[in-house]
Amino acid sequence: MIMTKKILELIRETSSSLPDDVLKALKAALRKEAKGSSAAVVLKTILDNCAIAKKRGTPLCQDTGTLTFFVDERLRRKVTPNVLKKAVALATAKGYLRKNTIDSITGKSYDDNVTEGAPVIHYVDRSSDSRSSSSSGTSSPTVTLVMKGGGSENMSRQYSLPDSTLGAGRDLAGVRKCLLDAVQKIQGYGCAPGILGVCIGGDRATGFEVAKEQLLRPLDANEESGIRNEELRKLEKRILKEANTLGIGPMGLGGKTTLLGVKIASRPRVPASFFVTVAYMCWACRRRTIELRGQGPSGTTKNAKKRKAL
């Protein structure tokens, strides 16, 4: 029951409070816009909404999204699917989550948000990830929750290169054309300003999995060289800069900030395939981690830190 309460609190905080890096990016975006402009009004409204939601402990957005848990493999016996599902049902009953889970065949609503495949649960090996270590140097297992709304999920897409309609070949120049096309097609439908999580390569399923995991990476992370490809680092910066010159702006109403961040990873591919997969996240980038130290279930809740790919 203690663990269920901790997961319940993780859900409440994730639903009602944005991570610090996302709030910082939204505030920086507001400072760039002309006072009284549509973009400034939208961003100010978003930030006011965030403050109210955090104060009241209520959802940031009416669409509390698909809940995806990433659970350290070392916690498998403590943080079981049953524990997670009980916490989700309690969170729904308390109003931290809306009734948001529908049977795709019958249209029936699962009013507690619990059924086969809901919530989404991944047990992952983090034991060798030095970035999950505590300040004392000991590795602490974690549970990360991501809540992704339907509006942003609908804007995710996948390209297959070469793409003659875009004039995109099988190289980073072609990848760039795909990503800027994705931003143009999203416009205001995905509740901009948003974040792009990208996977270059892999098969179709792996592409979406890895692209979505990029959304766990903090926007303001000073990621050390050697961990990631320098070419991808440069491409992230270029896409962010170019996307923010398109004039799409917050909610597609015009402005200087269309994207808050771009995070790109790559995976090997077979010669016959070259996929570019885009996982789009709206401004309500709800992600949070609970860190469980020691043998007992005590833990501290913190914003999700950078993760290595599954």
Question: What does each model-found stretch correspond to?
Answer:
Residues 1-129, 139-198, 203-299:
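Non-transmembrane, aqueous-exposed alpha-helical and coiled segments at domain scale
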